[in-house]
Amino acid sequence: MDKNPFETPVAKKEFNGYWIPSHNAKVFKEGLEKNKAPFLPNEKGEIKAEPVYNASSGYCLPANRLIPVQFAKMEKGFDSNIVAGRTAIGGFGTSVKEGEKGVFYNFRDEDGAIHTSSLFFAEQTENPEIFKEQAFEKIKTRNNLNGYSMVIGSSEPKEYLGSYIAACKGGFDVSVDPALADEFKSKIMPTLENDLKKHDERSKDLPSLSNILFEADKRSTEILKSISQSSGVDQDQTQKKAKSHKKEDMEMCF
């Protein structure tokens, strides 16, 4: 892409339906090429899986927001793991600093129309401590599977990312053979390259990054349910989380 969507004026429909997904694909691709992405392992195979919570809902972000936000966190060097929209931040007693840009994402309303919003980290607010203090009280998801560990066994994007996202949400350790991580990179790269093409030049045989993240998020829910059952974690708690999270999970990024 030779244009910056955040500097080039475009129609709202084009911005929502094309620029944001393409930007996400660009961020993913650059991260993989530099071997610097939140879901990639270090030389020992260890992956630092950390949740990022939506202060409004109290839950870890779904995949289509979580990973783009994690990329932004890595790039900007933020320490906080709580984000919120501009209006929600106002409700927490502070405001977004002038000139700060959030992480854009798309969602569909009940009528099917695509809208755009953005999320900001605590460090991007005028009073980060007040925001974090008040937002933390709303966080419902804790590291209920802390102490559990998983080794990613598949290089298929849905399975690989699904396992990583499950670790972020469940608070458990995750690792992978670096060679398998390389296989994952080679399998998801065609999708990223396809998403960066003009809309009418894209292959319909390849899934979009948005669809992969959507399926990976569903897979993470299945993994968490399976681990919870085998580990004896309160199933009522797990079901409540799934029910509360369902609407947000279904908001695909297009």
Features from the language model and the residues they span:
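N-terminal accessory/interface modules of nucleic-acid-binding and processing proteins
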Residues: M1-C253
